[in-house]
């Protein structure tokens, strides 16, 4: 049960999205991209491959819209 919770946390892109959103008001876009890359690596090392791709693409699209 505990392991399932940890895997679910790694799979969700919610953590990365919220963290990047909170940083947007404090720092520049480059810092946010670096933070998201770190999250992407962490999720990449987990066992959930579909969610890591979807989450990373979602955050990248979100950052792309903000930069335009």
Swiss-Prot record:
It is a single-pass membrane protein. It is found in: Host endoplasmic reticulum membrane. Coiled coil: none annotated. GO terms for cellular component: host cell endoplasmic reticulum membrane; membrane. Keywords: Host endoplasmic reticulum, Host membrane, Membrane, Transmembrane, Transmembrane helix. The keyword Transcription does not apply. Its main location: host cell. The chain crosses the membrane at residues 23-43. It comes from the Viruses. Belongs to the virgaviridae suppressor of RNA silencing family. Suppressor of RNA-mediated gene silencing, also known as post-transcriptional gene silencing (PTGS), a mechanism of plant viral defense that performs sequence-specific inhibition of viral mRNAs expression. The RNA silencing suppression activity is variable depending on the origin of the isolate. This is Suppressor of RNA silencing. It comes from Potato mop-top virus (isolate Potato/Sweden/Sw).
């Amino acid at each position: 049960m505990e392991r399932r919770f940890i895997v679910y946390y790694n799979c969700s892109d919610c953590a990365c999205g919220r963290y990047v959103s909170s940083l947007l008001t404090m720092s520049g876009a480059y810092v946010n991209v670096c933070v998201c890359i770190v999250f992407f690596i962490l999720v990449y090392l987990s066992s959930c491959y579909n969610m890591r791709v979807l989450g990373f693409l979602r955050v990248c699209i979100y950052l792309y819209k903000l930069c335009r």
